[in-house]
Amino acid sequence: MKYPKSGNYRSAIVMKDLDFDGTDEAIAFYRTASENKAEVHMLVMYCANGGWKLSENCTIDATDVDCVDFADVTGNGTLEILSGYTTYNSSVNNLACHSYSGGKTTGLTVESSYSSFYCADFDGNGINEVMLLSLYNTENDATANMLVYSEERNCLYSKSTVKMDPNITRFKNLSVTATENSQNALIVDGCFANDDTVTQIIYFNNELSVLRNPLFKEKDKNITQRSADVLCADINNDSVIEIPVVNQLPSASDEDKSNVAYKTSWNTFYQQSEILNHISDQIIDYDNGYSFTVPEGWIDGTYTVRFDKEKQAMCFFEWYDGTLGEKLFEIRAFKLEQWDIGEDSDAYTLIYKSDSTAYAFADVNEDNNLSVSEDDIKTAFSLLTVNNI
């Protein structure tokens, strides 16, 4: 049996109702030990008269299965099987597409390789397209390539291609979000060889009938490039993906920068003008699993934050005329047993207590232009979850 190496379906046998008749079909991948050449078999099976029937045994020239996904790319109301297969080049895979209906499986012609792919309705016509993403190598440029279905030719062909950052060495996360006109855009988090993360946004411009990648400029640094390992996410549960822009807060030139916190500015993508629209700012403590949302009244350059790693604390300060000003407050993470016995915690007010950690604040400065109330501190505190980091 062969197990897909990536994607949402990792089983060698995948169950999926391809024709929406209420009964799952089965898709199985295998390679026999006796085969001398590199071939992977994909079996498509359906249930009839109380037993399983073979619809098709598809043979693909490959050694392994990269991934499998399902989408209605033909617009006929059934799900096509999109399966990817590895090649001798670890960053290049080959795509195959098969359509199932009434017990019969037929192949669609696809002549495109990829590094990662994603299926969604990118042009708003109600039918899924296939977005192929390719990393740069000696054989291919770094591109995004949108495939659409041609009924006349029974194939998936390239409708539009756009350049991507050739310095990306791998893709970390792909997600789709709706823009202000409800059209889907593909959010692509990738990383460089030095492990910096960068975001690119791929969308189809219906007026020009072209793919666009507005955050990538060949001669300019992408504003989303960041050393912090933070990915695009829906931070406020509004079903829209936010894009982070990360910058270190102010510090003195001779200061230890490892203790200086970063500000993460969260933005949505505004398609009409191809800009990032600012939503909110956060200071994130990854080690202790929480974030603090910066008050709207705080202006950039007037505040800064330091990590006290010995105390497991995040300390907020005024930043005035290039120097560290008054302390505003601090948030500290206590081990639960430490908090429960009152060890070094008398001056602290509890924000939240989990199974292992108590989060609390202290040293609230009430006489500063940047002062915030205790209730505001509690409201701005948030635990990190899968959806909001």
Tell me the role of every PLM-derived stretch.
Residues 355-371:
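Domain-scale activation on soluble regions of proteins
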Residues 191, 317-323, 363-368:
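Secondary-structure transition/turn motif
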